[in-house]
Amino acid sequence: MILTGSEIKKQVGLGRIHIAPFIEKHVNPNSYNYRLDKELLEIIENPIDPRKNNHKFKKIILTDKGYTLQPGRLYLGNTVEEIGSDYYVTSLIGRSSVGRLGIFLQITADLGHVGAKHCWTLELKVVQPVV
């Protein structure tokens, strides 16, 4: 079941959904607009060996000047918000307005466990350079 925006607000108020920080104007008719935090990690090794656990990353700090994301690269980011619930399964879905720019925000693991409350990891890939 997908909750309406008004039900999301109600459940946040009752403490059944955790969104911190919660900004009421980010509530949509059936979702909440999460935000990308200022720090990204770019995986800089090629090829990536999943048997190893010591991958090399380049840290990127996003500023008002922007940063150009490049195709063929994988960037890891986090949501600003901690999101979760002890009562509902959380689903993190990208916005169509972002998708139309050729940005994929959540490639895997879009379903959260009941009881988990955390900043979500976002896997960012672009199909064209995007600032």
What residue ranges belong to the model's regions?
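DUTPase catalytic domain/fold
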Residues: 1-131
